[in-house]
Amino acid sequence: MSLKTSFDENIKQKHKIEKPKMYKVILHNDDYTTMEFVIEILINVFNKVPANAVKITFDVHKNGIGIAGVYPYDIAATKINEVKKLAYKNGYPLKLTMGEV
């Protein structure tokens, strides 16, 4: 037992943990999705406070795109899929894309 313990103590392990690549979730403007729906998804899916959700919504309306948030790939993809399902269920053609930061 002591042999194993001394052996384990002599092993130097270097664990290099890399930060995951981050991706921005981009909302695209369209002529059909209501601003109220966009604000709702920003609050409920992307956990934005109402004032920030309104600002992002106006960015989308004014500039054609807006950043909903920045996340690791899996989280960004999950949020995009969740919003696409909600948009489809509510009859909106809301487009979201993802871009590496």
Swiss-Prot record:
One Pfam family from the record: ClpS
GO biological process annotation, one example: proteolysis
Segment forming the signal sequence: none
Family matches, as Gene3D superfamilies: 3.30.1390.10
Function: Involved in the modulation of the specificity of the ClpAP-mediated ATP-dependent protein degradation.
Subunit structure as annotated in this protein's UniProt entry: Binds to the N-terminal domain of the chaperone ClpA.
PANTHER family: ATP-DEPENDENT CLP PROTEASE ADAPTER PROTEIN CLPS, ATP-DEPENDENT CLP PROTEASE ADAPTER PROTEIN CLPS1, CHLOROPLASTIC
Protein name according to UniProt: ATP-dependent Clp protease adapter protein ClpS
Species of origin: Clostridium acetobutylicum (strain ATCC 824 / DSM 792 / JCM 1419 / IAM 19013 / LMG 5710 / NBRC 13948 / NRRL B-527 / VKM B-1787 / 2291 / W)
Gene assigned in the entry: clpS
